[in-house]
Structures are given as C-alpha cells and as structure tokens.
Amino acid sequence: MTRKTDDIFAAPLQEMIDFKFDERVVAVFPDMIQRSVPGYGMIISNIGILAAKYAQPGSHCYDLGCSLGAATLSMRQRISQRDCDIIAVDNSPAMIERGRELLARDSQPTVPVTLICADIQSVVIENASVVVLNFTLQFIPPEQRLALIKRIHAGLRPGGILILSEKIAFSEPARQHFHVEMHHDFKRANGYSDLEISQKRSALENVMIPETVACHKERLQEAGFSSSELWFQCFNFASMVAFK
C-alpha cells in the first residue's frame, strides 16, 4: 500500500490549534513519524528485540499509547515465551480503528493482541513483564507523570522492564540549540518546509513537553526502578530501558 504523504502543515493556517491525533493525522502518521523522528525504525525494531529477551511466560506486555501498533507488531513478531499476550492502548479512536486493520494483516499472529481505546492513566497494569511508552509520556502533563510511572512499576513482575522513548530536552542552552537545529535539518532533509516545521512546532508547544534524560532517570528511580539505561539517542530523541 502506498504511504500517504504528510502535508497537514504545508499551507499557512489562519488559526493555530493544538496538535491532536485525529483522522487527518492517522491517515498520514506512518509518513509523519518516519520523516520527523530520527531513528524511529531502529527504535521500533529494538523494542521487539528487548521484548523477546524480557517477556516472561504467562505475562502481559503493554504498549501504552500504541498509535497504529508499530511497537505492538514488533513485539508480536519477536516474543516466543508461552502464554504471553499484548495489551495495546490508545485514547484516539481513529488510531485504534486503523491499528486494528493493520494488525489484522500480520501473517503470523502467534501472540494474542487486545486493542483498547482508553486513557492510559486509567488502564490497570498487572502481571506485566514488558511495558512500552514509545513517545507517549511526553503528552502526559508533567505533574501526572510520576504517578503513571509508579503504577507501571507496581504492575511489573520482578525482572520486568519499562521501555521509555521520548523527545528530550537539554539543560545547557548551547546543547539544546544544537539538537533542535539538527532535528530541524533532519526534517528539511526529509522534505519538510520551514513553514511546516514552524507550524507543527507551534501546534505541539502546549501538548508535548520534553524533559531531560536526567529528569527521566530521577523519576524512574523515585518510582522504584532499580536501574535505567539510555540505549538509544539521535539528536533530541532517545529511548531508555528501566529494570525492576
């Protein structure tokens, strides 16, 4: 199937509204994410590899903020432990509907997947061995993030992991400037205009709030995780794994 091109912010907008994962975004999301997030494909692939190593027999694996199910599919194709299932959650009905269609095309559905349209903050997390927050926590209000991470930790089995991917910020202005500029250059190289970059940045300003890696690591420790490891970074995008 031909991938639809993201042109949502290509024309000047009369009024800037906050970014949301509606039908327009869902229609172009695969193109948008690949052209906007450096290393996205590598992150998705390695989520499957991490899940294959840390999934435990008879446990749940959660994909919280699953969007179209890329991380879910990566885990599903890699997990071989007995009696594992995946619970994929997103609060966008359009994402869940389209994700269901894409997952149905998987030719080797060896691991059961349950798709749930809900706020991830209201979902019960229990008997988990792997939990994924792939560019999801950044959309949760900062004052609510610790409570969510604590609930994830409480719902994980001993030896379980949380995979946390985020757009990150830097406390030093020079580093922040460098990484933001390089990210913009990455997007330009992938065909986005300066207008598109500027308008999308404005739309995301109030709904996506990045934090430093140090802030994430401190929160993970406060939530009870024994350790965490930064395993991927490209410009201002990173992925960590936290161990219970």
UniProtKB/Swiss-Prot annotation:
Q: What biological-process GO terms show up in the record?
A: tRNA wobble uridine modification
Q: Where in this chain does the entry annotate a coiled-coil region?
A: none
What UniProt keywords are attached to this protein's entry? S-adenosyl-L-methionine, Transferase
Q: Signal peptide: which range, if any?
A: none
Q: Which Pfam families match?
A: Methyltransf_25 (PF13649)
Residues that bind S-adenosyl-L-methionine: 40, 65-67, 90-91, 119-120, 134, 201
- What reaction is this protein's catalytic activity? prephenate + S-adenosyl-L-methionine = carboxy-S-adenosyl-L-methionine + 3-phenylpyruvate + H2O
For this protein, what is the EC number?
A: 2.1.3.-
Query: A single Gene Ontology molecular function, please?
Result: carboxyl- or carbamoyltransferase activity
Its assembly, as annotated, is: Homodimer.
PANTHER family from the UniProt entry: CARBOXY-S-ADENOSYL-L-METHIONINE SYNTHASE, TRANS-ACONITATE 2-METHYLTRANSFERASE-RELATED
Per the record, the similarity remark reads: Belongs to the class I-like SAM-binding methyltransferase superfamily. Cx-SAM synthase family.
- What exactly does this protein do? Catalyzes the conversion of S-adenosyl-L-methionine (SAM) to carboxy-S-adenosyl-L-methionine (Cx-SAM).
Q: What is this protein called?
A: Carboxy-S-adenosyl-L-methionine synthase
* Species this protein is from: Geobacter sp. (strain M21)
